[in-house]
Design a protein with these regions (language model features):
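N-terminal G-site of the GST-like fold
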Residues: 1-71, 94, 124-129
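Short clusters of hydrophobic/aromatic residues that line enzyme substrate/ligand-binding pockets
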Residues: 48, 86-88, 149
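Active-site phosphate/pyrophosphate- and oxyanion-stabilizing loops and adjacent acidic/basic residues
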Residues: 21, 75, 138
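A basic- and aromatic-enriched beta-loop-alpha substructure that forms the phosphate/nucleotide-
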Residues: 71-82
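The first long alpha-helix at the start of the GST-like C-terminal all-alpha domain
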Residues: 83-120
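Alpha-helical elements of Rossmann-like donor-binding domains used by nucleotide-donor carbohydrate transfer enzymes
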Residues: 72, 97-100, 135, 139
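GST-like fold's C-terminal all-alpha helical module
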Residues: 105-149
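Residues that scaffold the ATP/ADP-binding catalytic core of kinase and kinase-like folds
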Residues: 51, 76, 112
């Protein structure tokens, strides 16, 4: 990242944006932190909806470009700070599996864990993005068993 680049990070405590905030801090990234009070509804105010029309966090703005969705922010930051060694570079054969597991988090793992923790039945197998909890956990467990990581 060049010294002229500018990162602005929109965060609310006790939300999924906390992981992205920790990543920014661990990377030593220069960024401006904007904290939203979601209990007061700041994420639904016109000033923030101009930034992120969905009114969600995390939101990262880099030189005017908006990045939302936690896995996208993680991937973007890993690519923006390649010296940290968090992601295989484009062209590396490991890039595909890396992207698979980064996207798996938001599209399969998190929805399955939330449904399980809230004691909700998953959607029908034909419409569920992850099948059911055990179906989601099986490939993850198999991958982690290969270790080390």
């Amino acid at each position: 990242m060049t010294t002229e680049s500018r990162l602005t990070f929109y965060h609310s405590p006790n939300t999924r944006s906390t992981a992205a905030l920790i990543l920014l801090e661990e990377l030593g990234a220069p960024f401006e932190l904007k904290v939203l009070d979601m209990k007061a509804g700041e994420q639904r105010q016109p000033a923030y909806l101009v930034i992120n029309p969905m009114g969600k966090v995390p939101a990262l703005v880099h030189d005017g470009a908006l990045i939302t969705e936690q896995p996208a922010v993680f991937i973007y930051l890993a690519d923006l700070f390649p010296d940290a060694g968090l992601a295989p570079p484009i062209g590396d054969p490991l890039r595909g599996p890396y992207l698979r597991w980064m996207v798996f988090y938001g599209s399969c793992f998190e929805p399955a864990v939330i449904d399980r923790s809230m004691q909700r039945e998953p959607a029908a197998m034909s419409t569920s993005p992850y099948g059911d909890y055990d179906m989601m956990l099986s490939p993850l467990t198999e991958q982690l068993a290969k270790g080390p990581y």
